[in-house]
Every structure is written in structure tokens, then in C-alpha cells.
Amino acid sequence: SDDEDSLGEVGKVGVPIDSLEDMETLFADINLGEVSTSMTINAPATTLLALYVATADNQGIPREKLRGTVQNDILKEYIARGLYVYPPKESIRLTTDLFEWCNINTPKWNTISVSGYHIREAGSTAVEEVALTLANGIFYAEEAVKAGLDIDDFAPRMSFFFGCHNDFFEEIAKFRAARELWYELVNERFNPKNPKSSQLRFHTQTAGVTLTAQQPINNAVRVSYQALS
């Protein structure tokens, strides 16, 4: 984070973590066995999770007690956000390796948050948001199975992230359709034994793209209305 290319980012888009010492400073006096930590991190997800687990190890916290989420969704970086580091093949390998490692070592950890929010913010429709997000989720699942994992080893810990826009009934329908489609796709393609493998667990945030700096009061109404759906 002391690179000159980082100067415009430090302190504005998250906490700069360059070392284990930084991670230990961030979580000083916080018992990692008693909290759930969500990290919006993608290309370096394996590195940041390793630092987090090492911090917990140094606190004496059993790894199986750790709870939280890494976003770890590299495909949407190629599609919408642009913050990728490695080529696609190697990036997907890191994603599925994290699935496998967490299944063995940190079974309460959510290993991915497949993100439609960024796709919607980049200009997609509600339909395109769901289509691309579920397509990405299925691709991750297929690659993990190819790597030797069983669908029930990782799918229960997959999570999703959608945006929430102004069209009240469309957004309600979108969330319901996404749940139903994921259930059908996972059951048809992977035949899981654990019912949690086909349950779409998701987080949503109101849409930044619908807001304007010039209308702060309107923004409050917009996000309140969006949250209702």
C-alpha cells in the first residue's frame, strides 16, 4: 500500500493490509472466535484469508470456530469491476483450492460471495444480473467438482450478493426467481444429498448507481424504498 499507484486508494476503499503484523493490529483485542468477519476481497482472497487464519492461530483460536466470508469472486472482476491480478485459469484454481482448504480447516467459513451487485452497477438489467451471477456460480461449482470435490463439500458455504434497485416488484421477483433457479440448477446438474447445497443464501445492498450527490434527501427515500423489496 506504499506503492505510488496505491496513494489514491489507501484509506478510501478499505483497510490496507500488507503483512501479518497489519492483520494482527487490525484485530487487536478482538477475539476472532466470537465474531464473524466479512472481507470484500477477490484476487488476493487466499492471501488475506491466510493472514486472518494466522492471526487466529496466534490468538489460540481453533480454526473450526472461525466464521466469516471472503468474496473470492474473480469472474465478476473480469465481467464488471476490473480488479483481477492473475489470468482466468489460475484465478479459478485459487478459488477452488480455497473451497477445498476451508472445507477441511474452517468449515464454518463462507468461501465465496458470488456477486451480481457489481454487474448491475456496471449497467446490466435485473435479468442480466441474475443470469450472469448464477452462471458464474454454476461455473465455480463445475470447476470445484472437476478438481475432485463433492458438491456437498462446498455448496452449503457458497453465498451470493445482489443489488436492489427502484423497481419494487421487479426486485422482489428477481430475488424469488434467483432462489428457484439456483435450486433447480444445482439439483439437476450435481444431485446433492445435502438440501443446503441448493439453497441460495444471499446478501443485498441498495443501489449506488441510483443515487446522486445533488439529491441527498431523495437518496434517503430511494434506498428506503429499495430496502423494502
Question: Which functions belong to the PLM regions below?
Answer:
Residues 1, 218-229:
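Non-catalytic terminal/interface segments that mediate subunit docking, oligomerization
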Residues 140-141, 181, 185:
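Short, well-ordered amphipathic alpha-helical segments that serve as non-catalytic structural scaffolds
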Residues 171-179:
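Extended amphipathic alpha-helical segments enriched in small hydrophobics
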Residues 183, 207-222:
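Flexible, glycine/threonine-enriched loop-and-boundary segments that flank and lead into catalytic domains
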Residues 186-190, 228:
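Alpha-helix capping/termination and helix-coil
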